[in-house]
């Protein structure tokens, strides 16, 4: 998923929306980001020990990046989309 796609799909959502990522059968909270090895894409880091990052925190950290930046999971797989849970948190897949 490109950064611009995420912005377009979430433009009417609350900026307090929490971010989660699903890998296989587990759903963990997105707690940090880091650059991928190519230094242009972003990896979403998940952890269940701390508070989940919100949509506003993610956009604040990524605001200087190009719109074509790709979002990746921790195992460097591209994120293809997301769905909402029953509390309207974003779960990336």
Predicted regions and their residues:
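Long, hydrophobic N-terminal alpha-helical segment
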Residues: 1-18, 23-24
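Detector for the mature cores of small, proteolytically processed
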Residues: 20-93
